[in-house]
């Protein structure tokens, strides 16, 4: 898997900077996680490995500005599924600050809070290549890029352009979505191998997405 950087530094320099400082390098993968699935986990794990991050935090949104609330199940279920998905998984953890804060989850507000709470951490905010095109429309984007380093996940050989500093990480295409899984379950089909078995067992036990 290839790593391409469209920023002023390289992976080697990033590793050297880590050795020379005590600052932690933490990735953030935000999402509705309704439910979490294997593509989420592959992205989080591969970004952590390719960039040599200390950890990647999966951050469930409370009320994302772009998601219909009617399609989002209770946060307690989403959080339980996240916990089951990363149980015993090295390098992945959960950040719940947006659930605790409640209200609409704007990335700028969240990252301002996290950087103030953890001044010894450098944050890498992970987004899909499709979201890179929308960065100019993000809430307070010019201030946000001063708080975090964006990491764009893309298919090999796919090129997305942006004037904002983005580290590009190439990953194989996994055409899995939460809406696909919900649709499978609603139609009585088992979404085997699309999400962790423990998560699927929880969905079945709780009767979710029927």
From Swiss-Prot:
One of its GO terms (biological process) is NAD biosynthetic process. It catalyses: nicotinate beta-D-ribonucleotide + ATP + H(+) = deamido-NAD(+) + diphosphate. Transmembrane segments: none annotated. Pathway: Cofactor biosynthesis; NAD(+) biosynthesis; deamido-NAD(+) from nicotinate D-ribonucleotide: step 1/1. It comes from the Bacteria. Pfam families: CTP_transf_like. Keywords: ATP-binding, NAD, Nucleotide-binding, Nucleotidyltransferase, Pyridine nucleotide biosynthesis, Transferase. GO terms for molecular function: ATP binding; nicotinate-nucleotide adenylyltransferase activity. It is an enzyme of class 2 (transferase). Its EC number is 2.7.7.18. Catalyzes the reversible adenylation of nicotinate mononucleotide (NaMN) to nicotinic acid adenine dinucleotide (NaAD). Belongs to the NadD family. This is Probable nicotinate-nucleotide adenylyltransferase. The lineage of its organism: Bacteria, Bacillati, Bacillota, Bacilli, Lactobacillales.
């Amino acid at each position: 898997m290839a790593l391409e950087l469209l920023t002023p530094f390289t992976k080697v320099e990033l590793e050297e900077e880590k050795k020379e400082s005590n600052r932690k390098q933490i990735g953030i993968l935000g999402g509705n996680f309704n439910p979490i699935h294997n593509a989420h986990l592959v992205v989080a794990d591969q970004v952590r490995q390719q960039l040599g991050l200390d950890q990647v935090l999966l951050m469930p949104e409370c009320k994302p500005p772009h998601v219909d609330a009617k399609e989002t199940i209770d946060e307690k279920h989403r959080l339980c599924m996240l916990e089951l998905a990363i149980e015993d998984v090295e390098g992945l953890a959960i950040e719940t600050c947006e659930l605790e804060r409640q209200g609409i989850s704007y990335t700028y507000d969240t990252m301002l809070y996290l950087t103030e709470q953890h001044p010894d951490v450098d944050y890498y905010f992970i987004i899909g290549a499709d979201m890179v095109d929308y960065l100019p429309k993000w809430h307070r984007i010019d201030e946000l890029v001063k708080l975090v380093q964006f990491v764009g996940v893309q298919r090999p050989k796919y090129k997305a352009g942006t004037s904002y500093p983005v580290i590009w990480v190439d990953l194989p295409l996994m055409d899995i979505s939460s809406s696909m899984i919900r649709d499978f379950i609603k139609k009585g089909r088992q979404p085997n191998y699309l999400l962790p078995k423990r998560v699927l067992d929880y969905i079945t036990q709780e009767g979710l997405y029927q």
